[in-house]
Protein backbone atom coordinates (compact mmCIF):
# COMPACT_ATOMS: atom_id res chain seq x y z
CA UNK A 1 0.00 0.00 0.00
CA UNK A 2 2.71 2.36 0.95
CA UNK A 3 4.86 1.45 -2.09
CA UNK A 4 1.90 2.25 -4.36
CA UNK A 5 1.52 5.69 -2.80
CA UNK A 6 5.20 6.38 -3.21
CA UNK A 7 5.02 5.45 -6.87
CA UNK A 8 2.07 7.74 -7.50
CA UNK A 9 3.87 10.62 -5.73
CA UNK A 10 6.94 10.16 -7.89
CA UNK A 11 4.86 10.24 -11.03
CA UNK A 12 3.18 13.45 -9.91
CA UNK A 13 6.52 14.99 -9.02
CA UNK A 14 8.01 14.03 -12.40
CA UNK A 15 4.98 15.47 -14.17
CA UNK A 16 5.31 18.74 -12.25
CA UNK A 17 8.98 19.02 -13.08
CA UNK A 18 8.34 18.39 -16.76
CA UNK A 19 5.54 20.97 -16.74
CA UNK A 20 7.80 23.52 -15.01
CA UNK A 21 10.56 22.96 -17.53
CA UNK A 22 8.18 23.34 -20.43
CA UNK A 23 6.75 26.56 -18.91
CA UNK A 24 10.25 27.93 -18.31
CA UNK A 25 11.27 27.24 -21.88
CA UNK A 26 8.08 28.80 -23.28
CA UNK A 27 8.38 31.94 -21.09
CA UNK A 28 12.03 32.29 -22.01
CA UNK A 29 11.16 32.23 -25.68
CA UNK A 30 8.39 34.79 -25.14
CA UNK A 31 10.58 37.22 -23.12
CA UNK A 32 13.44 36.79 -25.57
CA UNK A 33 11.18 37.67 -28.46
CA UNK A 34 9.83 40.69 -26.57
CA UNK A 35 13.39 41.81 -25.66
CA UNK A 36 14.48 41.54 -29.25
CA UNK A 37 11.49 43.61 -30.36
CA UNK A 38 12.14 46.25 -27.67
CA UNK A 39 15.81 46.36 -28.60
CA UNK A 40 14.99 46.84 -32.25
CA UNK A 41 12.49 49.60 -31.38
CA UNK A 42 15.01 51.36 -29.12
CA UNK A 43 17.67 51.08 -31.78
CA UNK A 44 15.33 52.63 -34.33
CA UNK A 45 14.44 55.47 -31.94
CA UNK A 46 18.13 56.05 -31.21
CA UNK A 47 18.92 56.24 -34.88
CA UNK A 48 16.00 58.65 -35.39
CA UNK A 49 17.18 60.87 -32.52
CA UNK A 50 20.71 60.77 -33.87
CA UNK A 51 19.44 61.84 -37.26
CA UNK A 52 17.35 64.64 -35.73
CA UNK A 53 20.33 65.81 -33.64
CA UNK A 54 22.57 65.89 -36.67
CA UNK A 55 19.93 67.82 -38.60
CA UNK A 56 19.54 70.32 -35.72
CA UNK A 57 23.31 70.80 -35.42
CA UNK A 58 23.63 71.36 -39.14
CA UNK A 59 20.75 73.86 -39.07
CA UNK A 60 22.31 75.70 -36.09
CA UNK A 61 25.67 75.81 -37.85
CA UNK A 62 24.02 77.32 -40.89
CA UNK A 63 22.14 79.87 -38.69
CA UNK A 64 25.28 80.77 -36.73
CA UNK A 65 27.24 81.31 -39.93
CA UNK A 66 24.45 83.52 -41.24
CA UNK A 67 24.36 85.47 -37.95
CA UNK A 68 28.13 85.80 -37.98
CA UNK A 69 28.07 87.19 -41.50
CA UNK A 70 25.33 89.63 -40.50
CA UNK A 71 27.25 90.82 -37.40
CA UNK A 72 30.42 91.14 -39.44
CA UNK A 73 28.58 93.34 -41.93
CA UNK A 74 27.10 95.47 -39.10
CA UNK A 75 30.52 95.84 -37.49
CA UNK A 76 32.07 96.97 -40.74
CA UNK A 77 29.24 99.48 -41.32
CA UNK A 78 29.50 100.86 -37.76
CA UNK A 79 33.27 101.07 -38.00
CA UNK A 80 32.91 102.97 -41.26
CA UNK A 81 30.44 105.40 -39.66
CA UNK A 82 32.70 106.00 -36.66
CA UNK A 83 35.70 106.54 -38.86
CA UNK A 84 33.76 109.05 -40.95
CA UNK A 85 32.55 110.86 -37.81
CA UNK A 86 36.08 110.88 -36.37
CA UNK A 87 37.49 112.34 -39.57
CA UNK A 88 34.86 115.11 -39.52
CA UNK A 89 35.58 115.92 -35.86
CA UNK A 90 39.29 115.95 -36.47
CA UNK A 91 38.86 118.31 -39.41
CA UNK A 92 36.59 120.57 -37.31
CA UNK A 93 39.08 120.67 -34.42
CA UNK A 94 41.92 121.53 -36.79
CA UNK A 95 39.80 124.35 -38.19
CA UNK A 96 39.06 125.64 -34.66
CA UNK A 97 42.72 125.41 -33.73
CA UNK A 98 43.65 127.46 -36.76
CA UNK A 99 41.01 130.06 -35.90
CA UNK A 100 42.24 130.21 -32.29
CA UNK A 101 45.83 130.74 -33.39
CA UNK A 102 44.70 133.53 -35.70
CA UNK A 103 42.69 135.10 -32.85
CA UNK A 104 45.69 134.93 -30.50
CA UNK A 105 47.87 136.63 -33.09
CA UNK A 106 45.26 139.38 -33.58
CA UNK A 107 44.92 139.88 -29.81
CA UNK A 108 48.66 140.07 -29.41
CA UNK A 109 48.92 142.73 -32.11
CA UNK A 110 46.04 144.68 -30.52
CA UNK A 111 47.62 144.53 -27.04
CA UNK A 112 50.95 145.71 -28.35
CA UNK A 113 49.19 148.62 -30.04
CA UNK A 114 47.29 149.47 -26.83
CA UNK A 115 50.49 149.27 -24.83
CA UNK A 116 52.16 151.79 -27.11
CA UNK A 117 49.18 154.16 -26.87
CA UNK A 118 49.11 153.86 -23.05
CA UNK A 119 52.80 154.61 -22.90
CA UNK A 120 52.21 157.76 -24.95
CA UNK A 121 49.34 158.81 -22.65
CA UNK A 122 51.50 158.15 -19.58
CA UNK A 123 54.22 160.38 -20.94
CA UNK A 124 51.63 163.10 -21.67
CA UNK A 125 50.24 162.81 -18.10
CA UNK A 126 53.72 163.01 -16.63
CA UNK A 127 54.31 166.17 -18.61
CA UNK A 128 50.98 167.64 -17.49
CA UNK A 129 51.79 166.70 -13.89
CA UNK A 130 55.06 168.58 -14.09
CA UNK A 131 53.28 171.58 -15.60
CA UNK A 132 50.65 171.45 -12.82
CA UNK A 133 53.33 171.40 -10.14
CA UNK A 134 54.97 174.43 -11.71
CA UNK A 135 51.64 176.29 -11.97
CA UNK A 136 50.80 175.37 -8.36
CA UNK A 137 54.12 176.72 -7.18
CA UNK A 138 53.49 179.92 -9.13
CA UNK A 139 49.97 180.22 -7.57
CA UNK A 140 51.32 179.72 -4.06
CA UNK A 141 53.95 182.34 -4.68
CA UNK A 142 51.29 184.73 -6.02
CA UNK A 143 49.00 184.03 -3.02
CA UNK A 144 51.85 184.68 -0.62
CA UNK A 145 52.65 187.98 -2.35
CA UNK A 146 48.95 188.97 -2.34
CA UNK A 147 48.60 188.05 1.33
CA UNK A 148 51.70 190.03 2.25
CA UNK A 149 50.34 192.99 0.32
CA UNK A 150 46.97 192.73 2.16
CA UNK A 151 48.66 192.45 5.54
CA UNK A 152 50.57 195.64 4.85
CA UNK A 153 47.24 197.53 4.57
CA UNK A 154 45.44 195.74 7.51
CA UNK A 155 45.79 195.90 11.28
CA UNK A 156 45.73 192.08 11.78
CA UNK A 157 48.53 189.59 11.64
CA UNK A 158 48.49 186.43 9.59
CA UNK A 159 47.79 184.21 12.62
CA UNK A 160 44.94 186.46 13.79
CA UNK A 161 43.24 186.27 10.40
CA UNK A 162 43.58 182.45 10.45
CA UNK A 163 42.04 182.32 13.93
CA UNK A 164 39.10 184.51 12.86
CA UNK A 165 38.42 182.34 9.81
CA UNK A 166 38.67 179.12 11.85
CA UNK A 167 36.30 180.46 14.53
CA UNK A 168 33.74 181.42 11.91
CA UNK A 169 34.02 177.98 10.25
CA UNK A 170 33.75 176.28 13.64
CA UNK A 171 30.50 178.14 14.44
CA UNK A 172 29.02 177.26 11.06
CA UNK A 173 30.02 173.59 11.41
CA UNK A 174 28.63 173.45 14.96
CA UNK A 175 25.25 174.75 13.75
CA UNK A 176 25.21 172.28 10.87
CA UNK A 177 26.19 169.43 13.20
CA UNK A 178 23.42 170.31 15.66
CA UNK A 179 20.82 170.40 12.88
CA UNK A 180 22.02 167.05 11.54
CA UNK A 181 21.94 165.47 15.00
CA UNK A 182 18.38 166.65 15.61
CA UNK A 183 17.28 165.42 12.19
CA UNK A 184 18.92 162.01 12.60
CA UNK A 185 17.52 161.62 16.13
CA UNK A 186 14.02 162.37 14.85
CA UNK A 187 14.41 159.98 11.92
CA UNK A 188 15.81 157.26 14.20
CA UNK A 189 12.93 157.63 16.67
CA UNK A 190 10.34 157.54 13.91
CA UNK A 191 11.99 154.55 12.25
CA UNK A 192 12.34 152.72 15.57
CA UNK A 193 8.71 153.40 16.40
CA UNK A 194 7.54 152.11 13.01
CA UNK A 195 9.76 149.04 13.31
CA UNK A 196 8.55 148.24 16.83
CA UNK A 197 4.91 148.64 15.78
CA UNK A 198 5.50 146.35 12.81
CA UNK A 199 7.16 143.69 14.96
CA UNK A 200 4.41 143.80 17.60
CA UNK A 201 1.70 143.75 14.93
CA UNK A 202 3.22 140.73 13.20
CA UNK A 203 3.75 138.90 16.50
CA UNK A 204 0.17 139.46 17.66
CA UNK A 205 -1.20 138.61 14.21
CA UNK A 206 0.67 135.28 14.17
CA UNK A 207 -0.53 134.39 17.67
CA UNK A 208 -4.14 134.13 18.77
CA UNK A 209 -4.45 132.69 22.26
CA UNK A 210 -7.33 132.18 24.61
CA UNK A 211 -7.33 133.38 28.17
CA UNK A 212 -9.24 132.10 31.16
CA UNK A 213 -10.92 134.40 33.62
CA UNK A 214 -10.93 132.78 37.05
CA UNK A 215 -13.69 133.13 39.64
CA UNK A 216 -13.27 132.78 43.37
CA UNK A 217 -16.03 130.15 43.69
CA UNK A 218 -16.77 126.66 42.40
CA UNK A 219 -20.28 125.24 42.25
CA UNK A 220 -21.09 121.51 42.63
CA UNK A 221 -24.53 120.13 41.80
CA UNK A 222 -26.18 117.79 44.33
CA UNK A 223 -28.17 114.68 43.25
CA UNK A 224 -30.92 115.59 45.72
CA UNK A 225 -31.52 117.79 48.75
CA UNK A 226 -30.87 114.87 51.14
CA UNK A 227 -27.13 115.19 50.46
CA UNK A 228 -26.99 118.48 52.34
CA UNK A 229 -27.56 116.60 55.57
CA UNK A 230 -24.87 114.07 54.67
CA UNK A 231 -22.38 116.80 53.88
CA UNK A 232 -23.11 118.65 57.13
CA UNK A 233 -23.11 115.47 59.20
CA UNK A 234 -24.25 114.90 62.73
CA UNK A 235 -23.74 118.05 64.80
CA UNK A 236 -21.90 119.52 61.79
CA UNK A 237 -18.91 117.18 62.18
CA UNK A 238 -18.54 116.40 58.48
CA UNK A 239 -18.53 119.99 57.28
CA UNK A 240 -16.17 121.07 60.06
CA UNK A 241 -13.78 118.23 59.19
CA UNK A 242 -13.94 119.22 55.52
CA UNK A 243 -13.20 122.89 56.27
CA UNK A 244 -10.38 121.91 58.60
CA UNK A 245 -8.59 119.64 56.13
CA UNK A 246 -9.19 121.73 53.00
CA UNK A 247 -9.27 125.33 54.25
CA UNK A 248 -12.20 126.04 51.90
CA UNK A 249 -15.57 127.54 52.84
CA UNK A 250 -18.84 125.78 51.87
CA UNK A 251 -22.14 127.49 51.22
CA UNK A 252 -25.49 125.99 50.20
CA UNK A 253 -27.85 127.39 47.58
CA UNK A 254 -31.33 128.48 48.63
CA UNK A 255 -33.02 125.64 46.72
CA UNK A 256 -30.57 123.03 48.12
CA UNK A 257 -29.58 121.97 44.59
CA UNK A 258 -25.88 122.80 44.73
CA UNK A 259 -22.89 123.59 46.92
CA UNK A 260 -20.61 126.59 46.53
CA UNK A 261 -16.90 126.33 47.45
CA UNK A 262 -15.11 129.66 47.93
CA UNK A 263 -11.39 130.32 48.34
CA UNK A 264 -8.83 132.72 46.89
CA UNK A 265 -6.43 129.76 46.51
CA UNK A 266 -7.39 128.02 43.24
CA UNK A 267 -5.22 124.98 43.91
CA UNK A 268 -6.72 124.41 47.34
CA UNK A 269 -10.22 124.90 45.92
CA UNK A 270 -9.54 122.40 43.10
CA UNK A 271 -8.47 119.69 45.57
CA UNK A 272 -11.51 120.39 47.75
CA UNK A 273 -13.86 120.31 44.76
CA UNK A 274 -12.57 116.93 43.50
CA UNK A 275 -12.72 115.53 47.05
CA UNK A 276 -16.32 116.59 47.52
CA UNK A 277 -17.36 115.18 44.13
CA UNK A 278 -15.87 111.76 45.03
CA UNK A 279 -17.54 111.79 48.45
CA UNK A 280 -20.95 112.71 47.00
CA UNK A 281 -20.68 110.03 44.31
CA UNK A 282 -19.58 107.40 46.84
CA UNK A 283 -22.19 108.41 49.43
CA UNK A 284 -19.96 107.63 52.42
CA UNK A 285 -19.27 111.01 53.98
CA UNK A 286 -17.47 110.73 57.33
CA UNK A 287 -14.66 112.74 58.96
CA UNK A 288 -12.07 109.97 58.52
CA UNK A 289 -13.25 109.28 54.98
CA UNK A 290 -13.08 112.98 54.13
CA UNK A 291 -9.44 113.25 55.22
CA UNK A 292 -8.47 110.03 53.41
CA UNK A 293 -10.05 111.08 50.10
CA UNK A 294 -8.63 114.62 50.36
CA UNK A 295 -5.04 113.41 50.75
CA UNK A 296 -5.46 110.90 47.90
CA UNK A 297 -6.82 113.60 45.59
CA UNK A 298 -3.94 115.91 46.60
CA UNK A 299 -1.36 113.24 45.71
CA UNK A 300 -3.01 112.55 42.34
CA UNK A 301 -3.15 116.25 41.58
CA UNK A 302 0.59 116.58 42.33
CA UNK A 303 1.25 113.93 39.67
CA UNK A 304 -1.04 115.79 37.26
CA UNK A 305 0.94 118.98 37.90
CA UNK A 306 4.15 117.33 36.68
CA UNK A 307 2.33 115.96 33.64
CA UNK A 308 0.84 119.39 32.95
CA UNK A 309 4.28 121.02 33.18
CA UNK A 310 5.83 118.43 30.87
CA UNK A 311 3.06 119.03 28.31
CA UNK A 312 3.73 122.77 28.37
CA UNK A 313 7.50 122.24 27.98
CA UNK A 314 6.92 119.93 25.00
CA UNK A 315 4.36 122.28 23.46
CA UNK A 316 6.78 125.23 23.62
CA UNK A 317 9.79 123.07 22.58
CA UNK A 318 11.91 124.24 25.52
CA UNK A 319 14.16 121.20 25.84
CA UNK A 320 15.31 119.76 29.18
CA UNK A 321 13.96 121.26 32.41
CA UNK A 322 14.06 120.25 36.08
CA UNK A 323 11.00 118.44 37.51
CA UNK A 324 10.51 121.07 40.23
CA UNK A 325 10.16 123.78 37.59
CA UNK A 326 7.72 121.60 35.62
CA UNK A 327 5.60 121.08 38.74
CA UNK A 328 5.58 124.83 39.41
CA UNK A 329 4.57 125.48 35.80
CA UNK A 330 1.68 123.05 36.21
CA UNK A 331 0.76 124.66 39.52
CA UNK A 332 0.39 128.06 37.84
CA UNK A 333 -2.76 126.63 36.30
CA UNK A 334 -4.29 127.14 39.75
CA UNK A 335 -3.01 130.69 40.19
CA UNK A 336 -4.58 133.86 38.84
CA UNK A 337 -3.76 137.56 38.78
CA UNK A 338 -6.62 140.06 38.41
CA UNK A 339 -8.78 137.20 37.08
CA UNK A 340 -6.23 136.14 34.42
CA UNK A 341 -5.00 132.55 34.67
CA UNK A 342 -1.25 132.59 35.43
CA UNK A 343 -0.37 129.54 33.30
CA UNK A 344 -2.33 130.77 30.30
CA UNK A 345 -0.73 134.21 30.71
CA UNK A 346 2.78 132.70 30.90
CA UNK A 347 2.20 130.53 27.81
CA UNK A 348 0.92 133.56 25.95
CA UNK A 349 3.97 135.59 27.01
CA UNK A 350 6.31 132.75 25.96
CA UNK A 351 4.80 132.45 22.48
CA UNK A 352 4.67 136.22 21.91
CA UNK A 353 8.23 136.67 23.23
CA UNK A 354 9.49 133.96 20.87
CA UNK A 355 7.86 135.65 17.88
CA UNK A 356 9.19 139.10 18.84
CA UNK A 357 12.72 137.81 19.54
CA UNK A 358 12.75 136.02 16.19
CA UNK A 359 11.87 139.29 14.42
CA UNK A 360 14.66 141.10 16.30
CA UNK A 361 17.29 138.46 15.52
CA UNK A 362 17.34 136.97 19.04
CA UNK A 363 17.14 133.41 20.34
CA UNK A 364 13.50 132.31 19.93
CA UNK A 365 13.84 129.23 22.17
CA UNK A 366 15.54 131.17 24.99
CA UNK A 367 12.91 133.92 24.79
CA UNK A 368 10.15 131.31 25.14
CA UNK A 369 11.92 129.76 28.13
CA UNK A 370 12.24 133.15 29.83
CA UNK A 371 8.59 133.89 29.01
CA UNK A 372 7.20 130.72 30.60
CA UNK A 373 9.37 131.23 33.72
CA UNK A 374 8.99 135.01 34.16
CA UNK A 375 6.10 134.57 36.67
CA UNK A 376 7.16 131.16 38.08
CA UNK A 377 7.35 132.67 41.58
CA UNK A 378 3.56 133.14 41.60
CA UNK A 379 3.21 129.38 42.09
CA UNK A 380 4.91 129.79 45.50
CA UNK A 381 3.54 133.10 46.80
CA UNK A 382 0.41 131.70 48.44
CA UNK A 383 2.42 129.14 50.41
CA UNK A 384 5.51 131.24 51.24
CA UNK A 385 3.89 134.69 51.31
CA UNK A 386 6.78 136.55 49.66
CA UNK A 387 7.32 138.61 46.53
CA UNK A 388 6.94 136.41 43.44
CA UNK A 389 9.91 138.08 41.70
CA UNK A 390 12.44 137.09 44.37
CA UNK A 391 10.88 133.63 44.74
CA UNK A 392 11.13 133.07 40.99
CA UNK A 393 14.77 134.20 40.90
CA UNK A 394 15.67 131.90 43.81
CA UNK A 395 14.15 128.78 42.27
CA UNK A 396 15.63 129.49 38.81
CA UNK A 397 19.10 130.16 40.25
CA UNK A 398 18.86 126.95 42.25
CA UNK A 399 18.37 125.03 39.02
CA UNK A 400 21.04 127.06 37.15
CA UNK A 401 18.77 128.67 34.57
CA UNK A 402 20.25 130.99 31.93
CA UNK A 403 21.09 134.56 33.11
CA UNK A 404 18.66 135.86 30.47
CA UNK A 405 15.83 134.10 32.35
CA UNK A 406 16.92 135.70 35.64
CA UNK A 407 17.14 139.11 33.98
CA UNK A 408 13.63 138.68 32.51
CA UNK A 409 12.15 137.84 35.93
CA UNK A 410 13.71 140.97 37.43
CA UNK A 411 13.22 143.31 34.47
CA UNK A 412 9.53 142.72 33.74
CA UNK A 413 8.77 144.45 37.06
CA UNK A 414 11.50 147.08 36.70
CA UNK A 415 13.90 145.59 39.28
CA UNK A 416 16.75 145.47 36.73
CA UNK A 417 17.68 147.03 33.42
CA UNK A 418 16.95 145.02 30.26
CA UNK A 419 20.22 143.40 29.14
CA UNK A 420 19.26 141.38 26.05
CA UNK A 421 16.90 141.16 23.10
CA UNK A 422 15.23 138.11 24.63
CA UNK A 423 14.57 139.95 27.90
CA UNK A 424 13.12 142.93 26.04
CA UNK A 425 10.87 140.54 24.09
CA UNK A 426 9.56 139.02 27.34
CA UNK A 427 8.82 142.45 28.83
CA UNK A 428 6.99 143.54 25.68
CA UNK A 429 5.03 140.27 25.52
CA UNK A 430 4.10 140.57 29.21
CA UNK A 431 2.74 144.07 28.63
CA UNK A 432 0.78 142.87 25.57
CA UNK A 433 -0.73 139.90 27.38
CA UNK A 434 -1.62 141.72 30.59
CA UNK A 435 -2.49 145.12 29.17
CA UNK A 436 -5.00 144.36 26.42
CA UNK A 437 -8.64 145.21 27.28
CA UNK A 438 -10.47 142.26 28.81
CA UNK A 439 -7.42 140.15 29.60
CA UNK A 440 -7.54 141.01 33.27
CA UNK A 441 -10.60 141.77 35.34
CA UNK A 442 -11.02 143.87 38.45
CA UNK A 443 -14.07 144.46 40.60
CA UNK A 444 -16.76 146.85 39.40
CA UNK A 445 -16.10 149.19 42.31
CA UNK A 446 -12.37 149.42 41.60
CA UNK A 447 -13.08 149.97 37.92
CA UNK A 448 -15.54 152.79 38.66
CA UNK A 449 -13.13 154.46 41.08
CA UNK A 450 -10.38 154.38 38.48
CA UNK A 451 -12.61 156.00 35.86
CA UNK A 452 -13.82 158.68 38.29
CA UNK A 453 -10.29 159.46 39.49
CA UNK A 454 -9.11 160.06 35.91
CA UNK A 455 -11.96 162.48 35.24
CA UNK A 456 -11.41 164.33 38.53
CA UNK A 457 -7.73 164.88 37.70
CA UNK A 458 -8.66 166.60 34.43
CA UNK A 459 -11.44 168.70 35.97
CA UNK A 460 -8.99 170.23 38.48
CA UNK A 461 -7.34 172.32 35.75
CA UNK A 462 -8.60 175.80 34.83
CA UNK A 463 -10.48 176.05 31.56
CA UNK A 464 -11.56 172.39 31.50
CA UNK A 465 -15.28 172.06 30.85
CA UNK A 466 -15.79 168.29 30.65
CA UNK A 467 -13.73 165.10 30.92
CA UNK A 468 -14.58 161.56 29.81
CA UNK A 469 -12.62 158.42 30.71
CA UNK A 470 -12.89 155.97 27.80
CA UNK A 471 -11.46 152.66 26.47
CA UNK A 472 -11.44 151.00 29.91
CA UNK A 473 -9.47 153.90 31.34
CA UNK A 474 -6.79 153.86 28.64
CA UNK A 475 -7.94 157.13 27.11
CA UNK A 476 -8.99 160.43 28.71
CA UNK A 477 -10.85 162.87 26.48
CA UNK A 478 -10.87 166.45 27.82
CA UNK A 479 -13.01 169.29 26.44
CA UNK A 480 -11.80 172.82 27.26
CA UNK A 481 -13.63 176.15 27.11
CA UNK A 482 -12.75 177.93 23.89
CA UNK A 483 -13.25 181.38 25.45
CA UNK A 484 -10.69 180.70 28.20
CA UNK A 485 -8.08 178.48 26.50
CA UNK A 486 -6.15 179.45 23.37
CA UNK A 487 -4.91 176.98 20.73
CA UNK A 488 -1.27 177.29 21.82
CA UNK A 489 -2.28 176.38 25.40
CA UNK A 490 -3.89 173.04 24.44
CA UNK A 491 -0.61 171.00 24.27
CA UNK A 492 0.50 172.47 27.61
CA UNK A 493 -2.74 171.44 29.33
CA UNK A 494 -2.51 167.93 27.82
CA UNK A 495 1.04 167.49 29.13
CA UNK A 496 0.12 168.79 32.60
CA UNK A 497 -2.83 166.37 32.85
CA UNK A 498 -0.65 163.45 31.71
CA UNK A 499 2.02 164.32 34.27
CA UNK A 500 -0.60 164.57 37.03
CA UNK A 501 -1.93 161.12 36.10
CA UNK A 502 1.62 159.68 36.19
CA UNK A 503 2.16 161.08 39.69
CA UNK A 504 -1.16 159.94 41.18
CA UNK A 505 -1.95 156.64 39.39
CA UNK A 506 -1.39 153.39 41.33
CA UNK A 507 -1.56 150.95 38.40
CA UNK A 508 0.62 149.93 35.46
CA UNK A 509 -0.21 150.89 31.87
CA UNK A 510 -0.65 153.90 29.60
CA UNK A 511 -3.39 156.53 29.46
CA UNK A 512 -3.73 158.63 26.33
CA UNK A 513 -4.80 162.23 27.02
CA UNK A 514 -6.73 163.96 24.23
CA UNK A 515 -7.61 167.66 24.70
CA UNK A 516 -10.28 169.14 22.44
CA UNK A 517 -10.90 172.87 21.91
CA UNK A 518 -13.93 173.73 19.81
CA UNK A 519 -15.62 177.03 18.87
CA UNK A 520 -19.23 177.12 17.77
CA UNK A 521 -21.29 180.04 16.43
CA UNK A 522 -25.04 180.00 15.98
CA UNK A 523 -27.25 182.37 14.00
CA UNK A 524 -30.75 182.30 12.52
CA UNK A 525 -31.84 182.63 8.91
CA UNK A 526 -35.31 184.13 8.27
CA UNK A 527 -37.17 182.79 5.25
CA UNK A 528 -39.73 185.01 3.48
CA UNK A 529 -42.33 184.15 0.89
From Swiss-Prot:
One of its GO terms (molecular function) is RNA binding. The gene is rny. Endoribonuclease that initiates mRNA decay. It is found in: Cell membrane. Belongs to the RNase Y family. Gene3D superfamilies: 3.30.310.210, Hypothetical protein af1432 (1.10.3210.10). Residues 216-297 form the KH domain. Residues 342-435 form the HD domain. GO terms for cellular component: plasma membrane. GO terms for biological process: mRNA catabolic process. PANTHER family: RIBONUCLEASE Y. The keyword Hydrolase applies. It is a single-pass membrane protein. This is Ribonuclease Y. Coiled coil: none annotated. Its EC number is 3.1.-.-.
Amino acid sequence: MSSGLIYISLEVLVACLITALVMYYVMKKIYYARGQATLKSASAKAKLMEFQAKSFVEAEEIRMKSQECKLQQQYENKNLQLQTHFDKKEAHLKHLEAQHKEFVRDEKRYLEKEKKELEKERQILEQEKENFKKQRAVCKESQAKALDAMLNYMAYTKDEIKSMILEQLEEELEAQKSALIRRYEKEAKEEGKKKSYAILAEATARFAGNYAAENLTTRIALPCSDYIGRVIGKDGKNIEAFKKVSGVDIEFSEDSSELCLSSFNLYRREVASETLKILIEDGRIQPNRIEEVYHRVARNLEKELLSEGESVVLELELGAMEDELKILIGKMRYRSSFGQNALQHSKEVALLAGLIAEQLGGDKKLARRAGILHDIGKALTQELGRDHVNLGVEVCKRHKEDPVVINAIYAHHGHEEILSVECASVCAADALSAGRPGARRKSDEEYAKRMQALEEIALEFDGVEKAYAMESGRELRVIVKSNQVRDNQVPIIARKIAKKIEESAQYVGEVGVQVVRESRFKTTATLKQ
